[in-house]
Every structure is written in structure tokens, then in C-alpha cells.
Amino acid sequence: MLNISKPLSASQAQTYHEKEFTAAEQNYWKQGDTIQGEWHGKLAAEFGLSGGVGAEEFARLSEGQHPETGKQLVLHRVVHEYKNADGKMVSPVEHRAGWDATFSAPKSISLTALVGGDDRVREAHREAVNVALNELERYTQARIGGNRPAETTGQFVAAKFEHDTARPVDGYSAPQLHTHVVIFNMTERDNGKMRALQPHSLFESQQFATAVYQSHLTYKLRELGYEIEPGKSGAPDVRGYTQDYLDASSPRRQQIEEALSRSGFTGPEAAQIAAHNTRDKKVTLSPDQILAAHKQIADEFGNQADKVVAEARERRNEQRPDNDRRQQVREAVTFARDKGFEREAVVDERALYVDALRRGMGEMTYPEVRASFEARVASGEFKEIAGNGHEAGRRFTTAATIKAENEIVQKVQGGQNSAPQIMSIESAVPLSESRPHFNAAQRRVIEEVLISRDQVQGLQGRAGSGKTSVLETIRQGAEQNGYAVEGFAPTSRAAKQLRDAGIKADTLQRFIAGGGLQAAGDPARKHLYMVDESSLASTQQMRDFLNKIGPHDKVLLIGDTRQHQGVDAGKPFEQLQEAGMKTAQLDQIVRQKDTALLKAVEHLSNNETTVGIEMLSQQGRITVIVDPQERIAAIAKSYAAHPENTLIVSPDNASRRAINQAVRQELQALGIVDKTDHSMRVLTPRNDMTGADREWASRYQAGDVLHYTRGSKEHGIEPRSYAQVVTTNAKENLVTVRKQDGQQVTYDPSRLRGIAAYREIEREFAIGEKIQFTAPNRDLQVANRDLGTIQQIDKDETISVRMDGPKDRIVRFDPNEARHFDHGYAVTSHSSQGLTSERVLVNMDTEVHPELMSNRFAYVSVSRASHDAQIYTNNAASLAASLSHDVSKASAVTFGNAQSSSAQQGLALAVR
């Protein structure tokens, strides 16, 4: 895989070149006493660089200079300003030299090349690195400065250094084939001027370059006769090695994993920190000593590498089956299309290539995949979307996506000014004024909805604006005038909140699948359909829903375009507003009882994130604790001091789990939660799997638990039953599962629908524990993400839970049957949407993935609080900038003119 480091300073790069990249110690493939390295890139050729990497040329490039003349090509930048002893501001400068991009072969491939002694494998690694680097270079961008977008140049200069051992652990340097590639911080624009490189494009291309490297390497290894299977992370593994031998040859990996386990953190950033903190000092060993150590371990495990290499050489002489390559490539691109456009309306070409290459890993080459994709672009299946000028890669949508978005807009526009009013203005005003506690915005919205002549209208409601009371009043007015009122929502929790407003409600998915509730018992009767949390609805859901409504029905789409968007493709609620759907504005927030907090939330709701965060800082609501473990401990102590009506929000599941563990330990120490733990095996959803993934056997892993909503008569699988994956057969696309009765069945997952995949994990629970349900349970009348507190755990492990909410309600269940629950002290921002709590503690770590630290996260998390919100962060200085990140979904069609009467008018604005 490919890892890209944080930027190296000029001094760091030069030190690494001397002591790391070219050092002969523990690298037994070298030329003389040093590793020479090799130049790479179009810019290297332009500079006249070829062959071995010289120290002087490397140093000059690291300083932003011409490698031959020493002329300064890229200006240095100010690192940071500070006051010296005389009180004067000093602005030191140091050039950002570049980035260390490291391509690492999987352990089984390293053993094959280095212990098995097959130099052809090493050559395959080099070739794969070169192919991946060429593609990485294609998306290189220049930093232009100011607010101007980056410019794609497609060229860089890089220095490659191949190594064959990992860092030592207890004096042993394990075999690890990898290549360091220093990509220097310079590129050339079309006008011939040199500019600094825009690193964002490098990191955007990281997964793409990884897929190209792994795909090419796998293809070459199969040509050499090796049998390849997908490893735990999806990377290719050579078949024939036992896990014990792989572990014994991976002490460095185990060292890092142990450090991660102690810290409680996961992810690439945490792994990088753990790797740095666990480095052993350099131990100088001769090549013979290193090889002897490899040989000793290999002998202990039966010299597996030698056997693998010998069998591959024999296998290569056998004739490989002549598969229909063209059909395989087409299927891989189709998979990429289905997977990518299930969750996004617009997809970067690199993401499509990643999915296609992983689907056809080892069976096809990257050029074949690219050629197949380009042919389908030419046929009109994929449509290129006009960008805003800063994208490194092309962005595409599909003809089907464009059609769906246009259908929705045309449906809504066709119903404008064509439907009868629910009430006249003379009747609506007295109804709204009969609620003296309502504010002006609430009364205005009630009147606008009831007197509207549009078949479909919108209600844009800010977080905490008193929406539930408004909907209850609209329901009463509609029912008084002969409408059957039904509610729907994309989530079971939102549907439940509609029921709290006296509205018969269900999930949008059930309505689409089964035709709705038909509350009046007469399909011909006129209906008012309320769709809450419409901003979470996908394009497909919205189209299917609107196609089911009758000519006499009216629809009220309710949502907030500033809160989180749905998982699947599209943003129809926002898109309809852009296309001219008349939308009532419920814009007066009533949730926050603290005036200062209210002001901050108002700014966050208006996308004025920097102002909102600054106000929270001035109010003393931001605490800085750099160390993540100390920060989590502080959050846990704060929660434990006042657990009632307190909610913790964290951006990712890893930190959420760590916080939950810390909180329960605090509460157990205080006696609030019982100290007797009960171990239970609960299910956590595999959110990484799309519908396309669920049809591909290779995406399942042994131990996965599958839930069948529909079942299968052919395979004897009952609806709503569970089974556990035993094995998978990637070649035949078959999955073998063990059903609850112990019987095993094998089937092709592409032929079954209605399957959800989960991982089984062990959790400790105790009486007094706050839990969160992670899936809806109709028998218990529990919605997904509902919260409750464990009141009792019987001897047979039956759990009694008092549910949160205005009604005192206890549910009882067998945790061996209903396994969808987790600790509930901390929740993610997405899970918190729709919740209200007096006090909210928010973990805002600027080091997590930028897709999680966003303006939507800031708005949703802070606005949960009615009285107090406290933010805990690692970096106050960069917090506002991190939270200003926009993660809005894209749409295939842009309706720039809100008064546009034709959906096709918007089409011309967006699609090339």
C-alpha cells in the first residue's frame, strides 16, 4: 500500500537522505556501501536527471532549487512568527521540501521475494511502483496562491529508494520490501513557471495509487505462477504461508498494534504516531547476519517461502485458463459504477478506478480498466460534470442519475399552483393565532403551509426551532379539512418523533416498498404526507416516493439543508429548493435557553462557522487538551460529575468507543454503574459495504453475521433470521453461511436481496449503564439510535432497559436474540441529529479525517444543547478552520436559477 508522510522540511529531508534512505545498514540490496536511489517523474527528465540520486542534487531540490544550477525556483515560506528576547517579531523561513510516499509490499510478498529469493517478485514490485507513480503524477497540481484554484500540471520530480527490511525490534530487522519516494515540493505550470506543489491532490490520489500498485503487482505475480488471495485489508497476499509464520516475521507490525491497543486509538494517523514512538535504535548488522536471521525463522516454520516459490515455478508452466478478459473488465467497471453512484451522484474518476481495480484484482491491468471506462464515457453512459476549477481529476455522473434528478424537479414544478388550499387564509390565521406561545416564525409557517396551492412544498427548519409543535398544529388543520395525515422519514427515530406529534408515521423505505399506511383506509381519499428529515433522503427515495402519491395528495417536505445529509446519493431536498420549490422558513431558534449559546448556534446555523466558534471561545466553552487520552479522561470526568441530561458527541466511532469506555469506568468508580460486568456479543454494522459490495463474495469475511430481511425459500433461510459467514469462494462468487439451526448453506450473494452485514464484537455491560440501540426493533417499539438505561440484568441475561423520553417505558429483551445495542454515553454527530440534551460535551479533534470535522458537525453537535455546550479540542488555533470544511454532497444537475421553469435549463449548467 501507499502511505504519504506529513511534509518534510529541507533539513529533515536531507537528514533522512543521509541516514535513512541511502544507508546500507539492514538493507542487503545495495550498490557498494550505499543505496543509490533512482530519479522519477517528467520534471526529473526536464532537469536532465537520470540514474542514481546524487546527494547534492537531492539537497538542492529539497531547498526548492534547480538541481544543477542551484537557482531558487520555489520561494521559502514563513514557518511561524514569534517574539525574540528584545520583543521584536521574528519570521524564520524554512522550505517545505516535499513528502515521503512509501509503497510497501504485503508481508507474504516480501517473504517470497526476500526469503524465498525470487528476484522476479522484487522486479514486479519495482514495476508496480513505477506504474502507480506515473498515475499519481498525472494528478499533480500547482499551488497558485490567494483564493485562486490549484492548477493541474501532471508533472513532478521524485527520488526513489528501495529498502528490504523493517525497523528493528529487539535487534531483529524483519524482511519488508518497500520503496521510499520523496516527491519534491515543486511543479511546472503551462507558462513555464515553477510553483510549490498542492499536497491536497497527492492525498486525494493516495487510495487510487495504492489500488494501481496492488493491482499491477497482483497481475504480475499471477503471471509468475503465484496464487493470490485477498488479505484482511483487501491487499493481495501470496497463498501458502501460515499466520504464525507471518506474525513471527512481522514483529514491527505487532509492536505498533500493541501501542495502538494501549492508546485506544485507531486509524492511519494514530498508527503513524505509534510507529514513531516505538522505534528501536538503529542496529548495524551485515547483510549476511540479516539473511541468517531470516533463515533461522524460516527454518522454524518449515521453510514455507522456498515451497511457495518452487510451486509457483511449476504452476507457471501449466496453461492458464483463457478467461474472457473483456467481459471481466466490463464487469469490474459496472461494479465500480454501481458502488460509487449508490452513495454519490457525482464521483471522481479515481474512485471509480479504485473500485474497478479492486473488483478485478490480478485479473486485468489498469490500462484495460481505463480503456473500458473511456469507451463507456464515449457511449454516453457516464457524463463528465463541469468542475469549479480546482479538481485534479475529472468528475462523472451517469445518465440514469441525471434522469432521476430531472424527474423529481419536473414532478414538483408540475404541481405548483395547481393544488387546492388545505385551508383558506381566513381560517388559517385564527388557527395559528390560537397558539399564543408560538413565535412569529412558527405562526407564519403554519399559515404558509395551510394556504399553499402547491402540491409539494418545503419547510426549512433550523435545529431547535419548535418544529414538532408546528407540525402538530398543521396536522390538526389538515384533518379538520378532510385530509388523512401520514408521516414518513428516512430514519426510524425521525418517524417516531412524527408520531410524538400525533401523526401516524413510518419509515420512508416501508412506504416505498409497501405502498404506505393508508391511514384513512381509503386510497382515494386525499392525503397530506409529511416527510421529516428530508435532507437525509436520497434521490432514488425521493423519486420513488413522489411517484407513489396520488393526484389529490399534498406533500410537505421537512428538513434542514445545513444539518447532516444522507448516506446514499443525492440531495433532493436542497436541490428542490434551488429549483424553485416554495419553502416556508422556520428560522427562529427556541431550543437554547442561554442567550450567549443561542447567538453562537445561530451563527453556526448560518454557516458562519468561524464566528460561531470564536463566540464559543469567548464564552469560555472551549478547553484545549492536546493529548487524546487526557482529553478523553477529562470528558469522562465532566460527564460523570453531572450525568443527568448530558450527552457526549464525538466525530468518529473510534473516539466514541474510547470515550464510552472511559465514562463507564468513571461511573463504576463512583458507584453510579454497577461494578459487575456482563460480557455480551453485540453486532456492529459493516457500514463500509454498499449494495454492490453485498453481491460480491470477496467483500465478506469469515465471522461476519448476516441478517436476512427477506430470506430465501430456495436456501431455507427464514425472513428476519441471522447466519454467520463460514467461508467465501471468490473465484465462484459463493458464500457459505451457518444458519441459526446449525446447518450450512452456500449461495451466490448476487442472487439474494435484503441482506445486512455485521461484525460480532464483545462488550461489557452493567446495571445502570446507558445504552444506545443500533437498529430498529419493531417488537420492542425501539427506533435506531434510541437511548435508554439498563435497570436489571437477570440470571438468564434478560435485560430490562428504561427508555429515554417523556414516557416512562421499560423494554425487556434477550441480548442473545436482540444484539443491536452499544454503550450510549457518547454518540457520533450523525447519531445525535434529532436529539436534545441540557448539556452537551463535544470532542473536536482536528487530527481526525477532514470529512468528519466539518461545518455540519459543528452545527449539529453544538445545537443539541439547550443550556450548555462544552468543547474539548487538541488545537484551538486550527479548530475554526477545520470545522469550516464543507462536506456537502454534489448533485448531477445544478439548478442555478431558482425561478427556472424547466429542469433541462439546469442540466446545461452542470454537464459537459
Give the positions of each predicted feature.
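Conserved ATP-binding/catalytic motifs of P-loop helicase motor domains
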Residues: 1-912
